[in-house]
């Protein structure tokens, strides 16, 4: 009886151990089967892919960053060229004429004529179309201080520069004053200098303003003392530019 009881109990223990081993083996097999696809998915997630399924590599980190952000290089635009005609304008520079007269240069230094403007010393500046123009004029003057003594009023000189227009509706022989400037200079004498002229003095008369002009009218400059004009660079000029 005792031997049979032990044998029956040992058989039950052996069957129970076999069952545990079978369960453990099945669990390990399921774990292995689940781990394989998860590992494959993790590896695929780490591999860079583009929309077409191909991997692209860029050697330049900056270019790679631009590609990742979707930047595109735009084509270079050619500079636009303004083909519209410019407004009439002129800038003339004072130049000496024979006989101590005042003439005007149209091409030297900063002088120019544009958009159909024309000039001649005999007839003045001709503007090609009706419109509102800004006219300006600056005439530099210089002189020498006279000897000491005498009446101070006799030493004073009034310098005058004027802009006129002629032609067109005003007729060829009927000039009209447009703008004018004037300045009176009284040189300071040196009491110690009784004979001979003193040092040079310098001044300028300038003005500008808006004038309505018509095609065919001509604008010219008239000055009071052409023998005192200063022809140094930037001292004497006049011009016009259409503003409306």
UniProtKB/Swiss-Prot annotation:
One of its GO terms (molecular function) is cytokine activity. Residues 88-243 form the THD domain. Residues 1-18 are cytoplasmic. This is Lymphotoxin-beta. Cytokine that binds to LTBR/TNFRSF3. May play a specific role in immune response regulation. Provides the membrane anchor for the attachment of the heterotrimeric complex to the cell surface. Belongs to the tumor necrosis factor family. It is found in: Membrane. Heterotrimer of either two LTB and one LTA subunits or (less prevalent) two LTA and one LTB subunits. It comes from the Eukaryota. One of its GO terms (biological process) is skin development. Residues 49-244 are extracellular. It comes from Pan troglodytes. Keywords: Cytokine, Glycoprotein, Membrane, Signal-anchor, Transmembrane, Transmembrane helix. The gene is LTB. SUPFAM superfamilies: TNF-like. GO terms for cellular component: extracellular space; membrane. Glycans are attached at residue 222. The chain crosses the membrane at residues 19-48. It is a single-pass type II membrane protein.
């Amino acid at each position: 009886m005792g031997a049979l009881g032990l044998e029956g109990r040992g058989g039950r223990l052996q069957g129970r151990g076999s069952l545990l081993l079978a369960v453990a083996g099945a669990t390990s097999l399921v774990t292995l089967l689940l781990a394989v696809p998860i590992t494959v998915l993790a590896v695929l997630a780490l591999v860079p892919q583009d929309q077409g399924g191909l991997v692209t590599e860029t050697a330049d980190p900056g270019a790679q960053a631009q590609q990742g952000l979707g930047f595109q290089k735009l084509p270079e635009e050619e500079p636009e060229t303004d083909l519209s005609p410019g407004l009439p304008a002129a800038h003339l520079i004072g130049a000496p004429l024979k006989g101590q007269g005042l003439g005007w240069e149209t091409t030297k230094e900063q002088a120019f004529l544009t958009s159909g403007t024309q000039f001649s010393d005999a007839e003045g500046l001709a503007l090609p179309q009706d419109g509102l123009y800004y006219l300006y004029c600056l005439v530099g003057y210089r002189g020498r201080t006279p000897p000491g003594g005498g009446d101070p009023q006799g030493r004073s000189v009034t310098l005058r520069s004027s802009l006129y227009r002629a032609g067109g509706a005003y007729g060829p022989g009927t000039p009209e004053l447009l703008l004018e400037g004037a300045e009176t200079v009284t040189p300071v004498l040196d009491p110690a200098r009784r004979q001979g002229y003193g040092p040079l003095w310098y001044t300028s008369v300038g003005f500008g303003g808006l004038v309505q002009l018509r095609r065919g009218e001509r604008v010219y400059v008239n000055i009071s003392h052409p023998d005192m004009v200063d022809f140094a660079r930037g001292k004497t000029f006049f011009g016009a530019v259409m503003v409306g």
